[in-house]
Amino acid sequence: MTTNDMAGIRRASGCASLLLALVISTAASAADAPNQAPALTLEKSVFLMRHGARSPNQTPEQLAPSSRRPWPQWPVGPGELTERGISLLTTLGGYYRQSYAAAGLLPEKGCPEAGTVAAWADNVVRRVPLSAQALLDGMFPGCGLQTGFAPQDKGPDPLFNPVEVGLCKLSVPKASAAILKAARGSLDQAARGERASLKAMQDILLVRSGTRCVNDAPSCGIEDFGNVLEGGKTGVTIEGGLKSATTVGENFLLQYIQGFPEKDVAWGDAATPETLSPLLGPRNLYLRLSRQPPYIAARNGSPLARALLAALDDASEASDASPAPGAPPRASRLVAFVGRDTHLASITGMLGLQWSLPDQPDQFPMGGTLAFERLINPADGKRYVRMVLYYQTLQQMRSNVPLDLAHPPGRLVVKMPGCDKGEIDGACPLPTVRKHFEAAFAADCPGG
């Protein structure tokens, strides 16, 4: 055998080894393929968004009894959307446009096709429709998209305010029992869990009151204000320390977001994320007790939840349950329902959703959006829903930071209870989501 013959054998042997390796590698890849999550394609997104940053709901004069120091003036009237709030929302809108264009949901440039983008807002307070409009303007500047909302002279929109208009009946005894169950039997005991935050707030306010003090003390600071339930025609409210602390903590937050000088944020005593964040604890507790118990959440949230499901599941009969005033066209690829923190609290209470945001102390931040993103598996046509909370961090709001794909807002994938089976990359099968929604509806509470 010649040297050339030996070389040929070695080459042939090498080729055979390479071919065998390729066959083994291909077989291994084929064996692994069933374990790989299929690539899902985004085909629709349904938003539930809170309005943007506003001024306090009270005038400085109305707030005066709560502190020894004067409250600062604001450039707009009480409870109005501020220019900072509009700017933050248009920034968010621009980010959503970029993100969803990259995913193929929205056009990268120009205006969307008619009927593919829709927004419907609560009509009770002006800041909500204005917030929805700022979102649309940020997403599609110059396109003239208009927010829909019910005529304000016709009263509250039943979709967002079903208990207030009598569409959904709420039993005061049942609502009171639901709140006390969530508080483990005692509102004051529940409030003690936030005692450190309340004490820090009292050290800022420096005011003592003689009303509603626990243990009938002649006077006390906000950390020792008592809490009581008061029933009315539109439900049950928690009056006392938690409600007062909710107002105060949120007003300090509004000062921080608005960009007030540090000396004017809680009079300089809570002007950093580290000192401000704990003061939002009582507010989160207040909403958890007053709005998220399932009985209360279902009465306040069922019409809106039906509309969300109808928009999300537009290929099924469920879409026929969507209330006519806020019903988006079936062709809509992006639908935004815009309301208040109480609406987010009601829907999350109904669905059993929970989260904690490490860089944002407000559980339901202004401009925060719970997005129900519908995806499809091109291989088998099955649909899934991924719930994502988008929000601006405390520092992004304070500094009005520009957002883009390289500098995104906060993003948290929210897990729905009962979605372990069949979940793909945080997305739950649409039939499972549908059943979860339907099980949470109040049977005696129709659509809006």
Residues covered by each model-derived region:
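Intrinsically disordered/low-complexity terminal segments and short unstructured peptides
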Residues: 1-2, 25
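Bacterial N-terminal signal peptides that target proteins for export
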Residues: 2-17
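Residue-level marker of intrinsically disordered, low-complexity segments enriched
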Residues: 4-7, 21-22, 401
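Detector for intrinsically disordered, low-structure N-terminal pre-sequences
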Residues: 11, 22-23, 48
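Bacterial N-terminal signal peptides
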Residues: 15-26
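Sec/Tat signal peptide C-region and signal peptidase I cleavage site
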Residues: 26-32
